[in-house]
Swiss-Prot record:
<dbReference type="GO" id="GO:0050136">
    <property type="term" value="F:NADH:ubiquinone reductase (non-electrogenic) activity"/>
</dbReference>
<keyword id="KW-1278">Translocase</keyword>
<keyword id="KW-0830">Ubiquinone</keyword>
<comment type="function">
    <text>NDH-1 shuttles electrons from NADH, via FMN and iron-sulfur (Fe-S) centers, to quinones in the respiratory chain. The immediate electron acceptor for the enzyme in this species is believed to be ubiquinone. Couples the redox reaction to proton translocation (for every two electrons transferred, four hydrogen ions are translocated across the cytoplasmic membrane), and thus conserves the redox energy in a proton gradient.</text>
</comment>
<protein>
    <recommendedName>
        <fullName>NADH-quinone oxidoreductase subunit D</fullName>
        <ecNumber>7.1.1.-</ecNumber>
    </recommendedName>
</protein>
<dbReference type="GO" id="GO:0051287">
    <property type="term" value="F:NAD binding"/>
</dbReference>
<keyword id="KW-0813">Transport</keyword>
<comment type="similarity">
    <text>Belongs to the complex I 49 kDa subunit family.</text>
</comment>
<keyword id="KW-0874">Quinone</keyword>
<keyword id="KW-1003">Cell membrane</keyword>
<dbReference type="InterPro" id="IPR029014">
    <property type="entry name" value="NiFe-Hase_large"/>
</dbReference>
<keyword id="KW-0997">Cell inner membrane</keyword>
<dbReference type="InterPro" id="IPR014029">
    <property type="entry name" value="NADH_UbQ_OxRdtase_49kDa_CS"/>
</dbReference>
<dbReference type="GO" id="GO:0048038">
    <property type="term" value="F:quinone binding"/>
</dbReference>
<dbReference type="InterPro" id="IPR001135">
    <property type="entry name" value="NADH_Q_OxRdtase_suD"/>
</dbReference>
<keyword id="KW-0472">Membrane</keyword>
<dbReference type="GO" id="GO:0005886">
    <property type="term" value="C:plasma membrane"/>
</dbReference>
Length: 396
């Protein structure tokens, strides 16, 4: 056969592919079954979030962040609130910090549970997602009992959180923390030593540490390659500095290492949650759940019924919003997917002049080409599963 008669085969992976994790379209160039090139086509879920935020007050902007990484919504709200608080130069009360950290760790478990179990489903294991969704249902109930919503919570506020947690809710979260490690152990037994699962993940999608830094990776993708880089330890925010937890790291940088890290991070998140609950119950864990400045946070209902000034403050906050001093700030949090950053520019008005969102999944998806090269077609879904990509934040 003449050389010119051989040509590579180009196929579409997605946008409706069950392993495509949302609306991803990959154009794959195949030589037989070997992947030669991967071309991700994004933008199918683009909603112009950054532009829409410019026309909203700081309070109205918060719900947009729930819709980015919609698997762990409160972690994104956290970054935006921290950025606005830095520009306003206000200190968040300790109880509000503890509640925020508690719910951010619930978000981390929500995200990792979904990722680990769907990664297993992508390579053929059907039981883990059923167990994972059962636990996620319980966690979403905790979201609902705190904020009134299962997914798009809009619970964080600039200066604190919307409302305090009822004591019964704190008790139920504590009881869940006691029972949940058993579920992780069950998943562990099902997957970690499983021969088929290991064959599909070990030495697949290897990323060296140098490559991870070059491509702007963060979170599990960097820790899987051997760097103990976690913003909760390296640049502690809120009350993470006083909490004890370990940072698991991998040594091979493959899909299996990333899976193992997510499993261990869920255990560490439970540890953090238990410490937060203990601190919430301690004598110094009481107090307000938001700043007591009525120019930023609305007064309580009881005050509004007694005081005309409180009523005026409430009306002005919900119609016009508060003004943020002019300036710019970049704040990043350790979201479940990696470093989620918000670059906030204020012109001194009641609306953000610019809000640039740094989504970790965006950097991870652009590396899909170099990670997948030389692998088989069947490995593409395993690699995609281990990158942990959610399209809300990639397309924004």
């Amino acid at each position: 056969m003449p050389e010119g008669a051989l040509r590579n085969f180009t196929i579409n992976f997605g946008p409706q592919h069950p392993a495509a994790h949302g609306v991803l379209r990959l154009v794959l160039e195949l030589d037989g079954e070997i992947v030669e090139r991967v071309d991700p086509h994004i933008g199918l879920l683009h909603r112009g979030t950054e532009k829409l935020i410019e026309a909203k007050t700081y309070l109205q902007a918060i719900p947009y962040f729930d819709r980015l990484d919609y698997v762990a919504p409160m972690n994104q709200e956290h970054a935006f609130c921290l950025a606005a608080e830095k520009l306003l130069d206000i200190a968040v009360p300790r109880r509000a910090q503890l509640i925020r950290v508690l719910y951010c760790e619930i978000g981390r478990i929500l995200s990792h549970l979904l990722n680990v179990t769907t990664q297993a489903m992508d390579v053929g294991a059907l039981t883990p997602p059923l167990w994972g969704f059962e636990e996620r249902e319980k966690l979403m109930m905790f979201y609902e009992r705190a904020s009134g919503s299962r997914m798009h919570a809009a619970y964080f506020r600039v200066g604190g959180v919307h409302q305090d947690l009822p004591p019964k809710l704190v008790d139920d979260i504590e009881a869940w923390c006691v029972a949940f490690p058993q579920v992780i152990d069950d998943l562990d037994r099902l997957l970690t030593g499983n021969r088929i699962f290991k064959q599909r993940n070990v030495d697949i999608g290897v990323v060296t540490l140098a490559q991870a830094w070059e491509w702007g990776f963060s979170g599990v993708m960097v820790r899987g390659s051997g760097a103990a880089w976690d913003l909760r330890k390296s640049q502690p925010y809120e009350c993470y500095a006083e909490l004890e937890f370990d940072i698991p790291i991998g040594k091979n940088g493959d899909c299996y290492d990333r899976y193992c890290i997510r499993m261990e991070e869920m255990r560490q998140s439970v540890r953090i949650m238990q410490q937060c609950i203990a601190k919430l119950r301690a004598p110094d864990g009481g107090g307000p759940v938001a700043v007591q400045d009525n120019k930023i946070f609305p007064p309580r209902r009881g005050e509004m019924k007694r005081s005309m000034e409180s009523l005026i403050h409430h009306f002005k906050l919900y119609t016009e919003g508060f003004r943020v001093p002019a300036g710019e700030v970049y704040v990043a949090v350790e979201a479940p997917k990696g470093e989620f950053g918000v670059f906030l520019v204020s012109d001194g008005s009641n609306k953000p002049y610019k809000c640039k969102i740094r989504a970790p999944g965006f950097a991870h998806l652009q590396a899909m080409d170099f990670i997948s090269r030389g692998h088989l077609l069947a490995d593409v879904s395993a690699i995609l599963g281990s990158l942990d990509i959610v399209f809300g934040e990639v397309d924004r």
